[in-house]
Amino acid sequence: MGEEVQIGATAVGIKAKDGVVLAAEKRVSYGFYTLSSAGRKVFVIDDKLAIASAGIIADMQSLARIVKINAKAYELETRKKPTVRSMAKLLSVIMFSRRYMPFFAEVLVGGVDEEGSHLIVMDPLGSLIEDNYAALGTGAKLAISVLDTGYREDITLQDAKKLAVKALKAAIERDPVSGGGIDLVLIDQTGAKEEEVKVQLLI
């Protein structure tokens, strides 16, 4: 029997009172071999919507393209932006339709619409749960303990950013297949802002 090959990634999402933060580390690994330290796992869909993912990079990119194309088509047809929940439901249907040959990716959908801020968590089969914060991937157990301790319902977007970085640093320090720095997307009523945080660990 062959050994299980672990495909590493850690992503977190936090809903703030004035927006949403999505973040993920940048390492792309296959087992304990690092393929790249510049992998992007957070994808801006439009100026009010983004997704973050943990799993196989190709599947993450495919799902991001599907959401982006459908969001743009909806906007062109209706002349208004889709809600966060409607795009999450679309993605859920697509993922469930592939349940016999699933996408190997867990997904966080985050954004802001007329109903406020939303963070939606999805497993590879498309199960859909709205939550205040979440962590996915191989470092999720390490990251979620930081989020459990630091989250509060009145958290601001900037404090949520700091908490997301802290959670991912905790995962990077202990999870051998996570690392390479951190990509973030901060979304509020003014739009989506992408940021990068470099991480240097003492070995």
Swiss-Prot record:
GO MF terms held by the record: threonine-type endopeptidase activity
PROSITE patterns (alphabetical): PROTEASOME_BETA_1 (PS00854), PROTEASOME_BETA_2 (PS51476)
Origin superkingdom: Archaea
Root EC class: hydrolase
UniProt similarity note: Belongs to the peptidase T1B family.
Alphabetical list of HAMAP family matching this protein: Proteasome_B_A
Protein name stated in the entry: Proteasome subunit beta 2
Species per Swiss-Prot/TrEMBL record: Pyrobaculum arsenaticum (strain DSM 13514 / JCM 11321 / PZ6)
